[in-house]
Amino acid sequence: MAKLEQVGSAVPLVRAGGISKHFGEGDTRVDALENVSIEVFPGQVVALLGPSGSGKSTLLNVIGCILDPSEGKLELDGDLVYDNRWLRSDLRRLRLDKIGFIFQFHNLLPFLDAKDNVALVLQLAGADSRSARVRAVELLDYLEVGNRKDSLPSKLSGGEAQRVAIARALANKPRIILADEPTAALDSVRAGIVMDLLRKLAAEQDAAVIAVTHDDKIFDRFDHMYHLRDGRLDGNGGA
């Protein structure tokens, strides 16, 4: 297993061991991932790199409990996922409680303002509307877009919308943040700001951030980079 340097007594928030993912059967089978193993510790910001079709997004979706692995083991914050104890409802609860997702395109609901886009995640997890909105405004203030809390997504700049999307991802205080091309739609200045925010969040919340990216503008923001090619870790697994 390719391991990152362990600091103190920290244990991995994400431990993927021998993960394989296959689609289809027989002549139509596609091997999207083959025996991929990674570890990510609290406070670390890690990149998944590789050409299109290398398996980066598939691995992210397995870690995010969106896709089931065909083989291998996955531990998230100490929980062994996909063993016989886990029902689909358990996986949904795990995603709500422990995982935050950030995507290339923010996918904010166009008919809700910024604060209600964030508050909706909390309400789905069981919070009442008032406390959800209070938490949403706190997050927007923290990400320096509190002055846009009443704005619809169509009125936000690309950078502002992505910060709202980050606030939404952080609503339930996840320990694991998964980002799929989070800066691809941003210029170099805004991309740097978003990555600096993710680094700050990882440090302050003792969270793990895993990002799929092709964006060489932000490579210097990562603690470690895993390179994938044809569904396998390239070389020694990372740098």
Model-predicted segments: where are they?
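ABC family nucleotide-binding domain
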Residues: L13-R229
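Conserved switch/coupling elements of ABC/ABC-like ATPase nucleotide-binding domains
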Residues: L80, D230-A239
